[in-house]
Every structure is written in C-alpha cells, then in structure tokens.
Amino acid sequence: LTPGMKTIAGRLAYLLAGAGVIASFDPPSVAVTIGGESLGARQYQLFVVCNGPTIGGGHRAAPRARPDDGLLDACLVEASGTLDLVALLRRLSKGEHLDAEGVTYRQLQSAELAFDRVLKVNTDGEVIETRICRYRVLPGAARFIA
C-alpha cells in the first residue's frame, strides 16, 4: 500500500489490497515451531505475530495480545477456499475468529516459521523477502506505558 492509499481509504485500503492478494495467492507450506514445539508443516494462507491486538487499519487479529505481558501472540490461518477465507477475515477484523476452523492462536515467547520458498513478508509495514521468520521476546528491551 502506498502512504496515500492508507491516508485516503483507511481500513478500506487494506481490504482492497488484501482482496487482490487473496485472488492470486498460492499458500506456502510452513513448518511452525513455537517455544521449541513443532506444530508440523501445513499450508497457511495468513499468519500474524503481534505484540498488540490490532494490525493494519485496526483489524483485531490478536485480540488477547497485550504489549506489557511479556508474550507475543501468533495467529495462523490454514489455507482454504476464497469464500471461506473472506468470511474468516470478516471475523478476524472484529477479533471473533479464535474458535474458527483452521485457526491456530498461541501466546509465545519464541517462534520460527520456515517457508517452502522465499516469500514477501510484511514486518510492521516494511516488506522483506525471506524463507524463515524468527520471533522472540526480549524482556526489558523496551518500556511501555499500559
């Protein structure tokens, strides 16, 4: 998204950009390890790792996340049909997706996601290309007022 799109359209800009990606996206196989425990490899359509409850435009992807709890929250969405994904994304926007089929939600101190190919990954607004994403909590590295 361009800065202009974000300013003009707000949440709608994220939805429009996402719709284009959904239509052409080929879900990768992702080997997931959380806190040293392997969850195996599956095809995932979406994953987020958050320190707060919302992502782009206010969507509540990690409704249990708190910046001061010493944990990161991960939400992984298994690959599904386009209509199923669109319905799930509506629930995700409101933070009502945690009990949905195909959704894995964990609170963690460390995680690794290894993709079967290089992917473009949005890391807090910056896009990087990678085959592995590693996340870990660094206690005391930042101070927050909550």
Feature annotation, model-predicted:
Residues L1-A146:
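Long C-terminal subdomains/extensions of small-metabolite kinases
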